[in-house]
């Protein structure tokens, strides 16, 4: 989402999944590069918000730590990072614990 906010392609353009360097890499690397690219264009990340959907594991005990890590990686006040965790009420592949889902949005201020 941050790369698209500055008119770039998706994350795969910067970190192709065919490149073995990125296999198992910490996600902080990707966030820091996205923030760097925004800053290079004189932009400012205003806030970010994410919804995490998982039947298991329970994510709520980790939300505050995630917020702190994301805020640190993006250079934001933790109050500017929203994370919500929910289940899928045992429906679909998420409810069967076959996967999880995440949706995120960011507000980015760019010069004209």
Segment roles from a protein language model:
Residues 35-42, 67-70, 74, 78, ...:
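Structural signal for hydrophobic packing residues in well-ordered secondary-structure cores
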Residues 1-2:
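Short, small-residue-biased leader/transition segments that mark boundaries at the very start
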Residues 5-8, 112:
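Short helix-capping/linker segments at secondary-structure and domain boundaries
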Residues 9-14, 94-97, 101:
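Gly/Ser/Thr-rich beta-alpha loop segments that engage phosphate groups in nucleotides
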Residues 96-112:
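C-terminal edge-of-domain segments
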Residues 7-44:
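Helix-adjacent hinge/juxtasegments
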Residues 48-58, 62-94:
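Short, conserved loop-to-beta-strand elements that form functional interface hotspots
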């Amino acid at each position: 989402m941050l790369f698209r906010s500055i008119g770039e392609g998706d994350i795969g353009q910067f970190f192709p999944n065919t490149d073995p360097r990125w296999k198992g890499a910490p996600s902080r690397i990707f966030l820091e590069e996205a923030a760097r690219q925004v800053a290079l264009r004189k932009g400012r990340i205003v806030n970010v918000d994410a919804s995490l959907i998982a039947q298991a594991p329970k994510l709520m005990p980790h939300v505050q730590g995630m917020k702190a890590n994301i805020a640190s990686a993006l250079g934001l006040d933790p109050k500017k990072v929203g994370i919500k965790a929910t289940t899928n009420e045992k429906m679909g592949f998420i409810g069967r614990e076959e996967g999880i889902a995440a949706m995120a949005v960011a507000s980015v201020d760019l010069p004209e």
